[in-house]
């Protein structure tokens, strides 16, 4: 840190800002950023918004702002959306079964392997057999309707519908990149530039937030 600026090699702004504001608390509830990140030994520009102590309305407003940026500055649009929640795995799979082998098979969507380890009737197998557009409907049969993850996913799906996005997919296979990612995540895939994905997710570590980021 030099003259109130952060200098560091980073592959992600969220983690860097989380560390910084843990050491130097701020009253700001929203932070916008842009800068270089290093991934796969290459530099790329990342832009993003972090919402601290986030409310649903604030996060959705930030997403609308980001989509406006995509439309106006990048001349692109969101083609389809992927939703997921990092609490789903614990809701669907007993802790004793969350072995490295089984988690790897879930991430790879290895149905034949999962049938061997879990059985054909296991909720994860039954959900993964369905088209990802239908998986949220199937999920309702396997966890209580008042489960926080299911409630949150339904809220987001309804809101996305009001914004005109009907092509919505569920991902139950994703595992958190860091331990503080504990809630809902979203991926907005572009219509024209298919390599670009606006990603976002809820986290709770030393501070609570919801970040949205896009690598250009």
Where are these regions (language model features)?
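TRNA-recognition modules of translation machinery and tRNA-sensing kinases, especially anticodon-binding
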Residues: 1-216
């Amino acid at each position: 840190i030099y003259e109130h600026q952060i200098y560091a090699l980073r592959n992600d702004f969220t983690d860097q800002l989380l560390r910084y504001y843990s050491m130097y608390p701020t009253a700001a509830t929203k932070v916008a950023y842009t800068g270089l990140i290093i991934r796969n030994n290459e530099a790329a520009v990342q832009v993003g918004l972090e919402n601290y102590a986030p409310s649903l309305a604030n996060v959705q407003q930030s997403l609308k702002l980001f989509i406006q940026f995509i439309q106006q500055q990048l001349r692109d649009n969101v083609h389809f959306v992927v939703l997921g929640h990092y609490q789903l795995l614990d809701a669907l799979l007993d802790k004793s079964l969350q072995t490295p082998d089984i988690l790897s098979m879930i991430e790879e969507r290895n149905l034949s392997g999962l049938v061997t380890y879990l059985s054909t009737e296991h909720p994860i197998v039954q959900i993964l057999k369905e088209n990802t557009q239908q998986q949220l409907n199937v999920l309702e049969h396997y966890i209580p309707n008042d489960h926080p993850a299911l409630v949150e996913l339904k809220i987001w799906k309804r809101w996305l519908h009001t914004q005109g996005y009907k092509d919505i997919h569920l991902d139950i296979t994703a595992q958190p990149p860091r331990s503080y990612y504990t809630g809902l995540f979203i991926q907005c895939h572009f219509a024209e530039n298919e390599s670009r994905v606006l990603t976002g997710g809820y986290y709770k570590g030393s501070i609570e937030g919801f970040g949205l980021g896009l690598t250009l």
